């Protein structure tokens, strides 16, 4: 539904999504070795992981990337801050609120 609302506004969509932290897989090592299988992967065992430091480096440029796809600087900074807060364990807003602000911002543009 949200993708349809954004598409109706004829804007470009940029989705930035993290894989899992590499250290999240370490607790699976004993089970993987015991069963000769890695549970949780798809197809040919491909996974998406990165070190926390790598994801932190990418997050530093997140607000800049949001501005480059057309969001205002203030709004991009707000979304980047929400994402940083959420990644640090604090849920600062719900998804409905974010999409409300995205749609509102599109109407103001």
Curated annotation (Swiss-Prot):
To E.coli YtfG C-terminal region. This is Uncharacterized protein HI_0742. InterPro entries: NmrA-type_oxidoreductase. It comes from Haemophilus influenzae (strain ATCC 51907 / DSM 11121 / KW20 / Rd).
């Amino acid at each position: 539904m949200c993708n349809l609302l954004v598409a109706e506004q004829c804007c470009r969509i940029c989705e930035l999504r993290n894989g899992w932290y590499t250290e999240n897989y370490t607790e699976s090592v004993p089970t993987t070795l015991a069963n000769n299988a890695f549970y949780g992967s798809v197809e040919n065992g491909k996974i998406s992981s990165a070190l926390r430091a790598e994801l932190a480096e990418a997050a530093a440029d997140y607000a800049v990337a949001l501005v480059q796809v057309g969001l205002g600087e203030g709004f991009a900074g707000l979304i980047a801050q929400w994402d940083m807060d959420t990644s640090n364990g604090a849920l600062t807003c719900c998804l409905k609120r974010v999409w409300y602000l995205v749609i509102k911002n599109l109407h103001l543009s």
